[in-house]
Amino acid sequence: MKEIIRSIKGMHDYIPDDVITWQYIEYIVKRILKNYCYNEIRFPLIEKTSLFAHSIGNITDIIEKEMYSFKDKKNKKITLRPEGTIGCMRACINKGLLRTSKQKLWYLGPMFRYERPQHGRYRQFHQFGIEVLGMSGPDIDLEIILLVERILRTLNISNYVQLELNSIGSYESRLHYKKILFSYFKQYEACLDEDCKRRLYVNPLRILDSKDKNIKAIINNAPILMDFIDDNSLIHFENLCKLMKNIGISYVVNYKLVRGLDYYNKTVFEWKTNLLGAKDAICAGGRYDNLSKSLGVTFIPAIGCAIGMERLVLLIKSLKLKPKTNNAIDVFIIFLKDNIQIEAIKLSELVRTQFPKKKIMLSILSSNLRKQFSTANKIKARIVLLLGPNEVKNNLILLKDLTSGYQKSFLKNKIIEELELAFKN
């Protein structure tokens, strides 16, 4: 017996029952993004490896360990995108979108990272990305936060997440802070795990992300970045906090919150939940004003965030908030003889044309009326249209409403009129 080929580790299939929740989330998020005047952008899953190396930073986990990179047939190094912000910025630069106007954009799609698969973290995962390019004030930071808050409220999960906020200042202030952190963590090097020991020498900021309980105690007493950030970043953060207070947005300042990518600056934020274990961030983002310069163009202020679809689905399912769906079939068409099949197909296409929002199913059986009606009941069909030899001979159609038991025969040319009447009842 041949070995069954299975999906790649860390990459998942989503069957129709799973997709119902995904589609519900996508519908809500897209509706709200449209409400806020954000436009969709699409860009490739594969980019030149150098794009990410220049932008993310050579000493991040993504560059060092997690990227899916390989050489194409021309020996050029390419990478499956590990996140969407950089590709979005590149696309906007290449297409000249930032020459004439500011951009408010969104995208949805798969990202790829070679991580150890675990609950809520996969090697292929999906993100809703929200990006604003060309705006620098705290007011646009506020808009992004308001937008995500609205999404969470509409999905009925806002009571189960907490917004955490911080400022990581400028690149220069972080360089100074890294030296302070190095000196602090160096005292506890013997207590650090192997990963944190490595981070100590390449990027001590990343130690702040450790989930190890023993290391958490050391982190809690570490110097805070807010004490070392530049005045401009501090004023920006204070103004944002004032705006949020005036609007009435609940948040906590987490002085240990940093982002895993080097291009971030100033405002950073995460929505976290305690219902999904250690991998608790549902949405994360911040400002990345210097990303454009790392891509070789002029300064373009920017802010964005990414909503993790898989984690959002897990949270909704854990709360038993799975959306109610109507899987019932509106019209089930039955034919009783093989030689009537063409007439039945024509009828089904006519009904689909006239009622494009209704669910129309054509029976695959051509005999045994009892079995066909049994099928109609199993699929929760509301209306059955029956074509038998007598109906075809007399140019008739039999309609039966399985909800009320009402049935009626009528001339074929009355089908639209009769269905409209049946749908109203």
Curated annotation (Swiss-Prot):
UniProt GO molecular function: ATP binding; histidine-tRNA ligase activity
SUPFAM superfamilies: Class II aaRS ABD-related, Class II aaRS and biotin synthetases
InterPro entries assigned to the protein according to its UniProt record, in alphabetical order: aa-tRNA-synth_II, aa-tRNA-synth_II/BPL/LPL, Anticodon-bd, Anticodon-bd_dom_sf, His-tRNA-ligase, HisRS-like_core, HisRS/HisZ
Signal peptide: none
Cellular compartments annotated: Cytoplasm
Pfam annotation, one family: tRNA-synt_His
First-level EC class: ligase
Keywords of this entry: Aminoacyl-tRNA synthetase, ATP-binding, Cytoplasm, Ligase, Nucleotide-binding, Protein biosynthesis
E.C. designation(s): 6.1.1.21
GO BP of this protein: histidyl-tRNA aminoacylation
Catalysed conversion reaction: tRNA(His) + L-histidine + ATP = L-histidyl-tRNA(His) + AMP + diphosphate + H(+)
Keyword flag Nucleotide-binding: yes
GO cellular component: a single term: cytoplasm
PROSITE patterns referenced in this protein's UniProt entry, alphabetically: AA_TRNA_LIGASE_II
Protein family: Belongs to the class-II aminoacyl-tRNA synthetase family.
Name of the featured protein: Histidine--tRNA ligase
Source organism of the structure: Buchnera aphidicola subsp. Baizongia pistaciae (strain Bp)
Organism lineage: Bacteria, Pseudomonadati, Pseudomonadota, Gammaproteobacteria, Enterobacterales
